[in-house]
């Protein structure tokens, strides 16, 4: 049963063109979590894209599953909780800043490239702002269609601005969105202020300043969900505000 689940998880998570040599390491790295206490799979990022055992698989996924049968990635006697993302934005984030408050020595912040240039201290707002507004060299900073077709399914390739992206809201859109997603009435949104960033520049805590209420939210996923009808690609973002000439207190967008 477990191997059957892995076959169908690997298929939606990776294209049929994915290099066979990389699939075994992908399986060992990710799909080796300890069993949930009360159920086998969850709908969170922990279990990725499990879509049922009847979901079509690929020969590559099937071969990789059987080639890695019984293999797990360990650290000091425990199975590694080795999360991953399709695009890190140029820098890895430390585990505790995105998920549970547990610091894993094998999941640390570092640069996603071969360059010897040291990763800036992206916990500092000035450095994070500069980093996010530029496009540093990184393995995931590519528009090479041949490379992308090997690692992403067709529907994932529809997103072309995954490395650096932009979202724009009017005052009304933003205030209504935050109210709907958080269940809290902030009134008009005056500002979104970074309170804490992780080692990759991702926001861990964000202060929402409204005309009726001010509140700090976090962590990373809550911030992404609050500021989008689904979720933002990342919490590694900076905010620019625009004002109308006759209104300098509250941004128009």
Language model features with spans:
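Conserved, single-site charged/polar hotspot
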Residues: 1-253
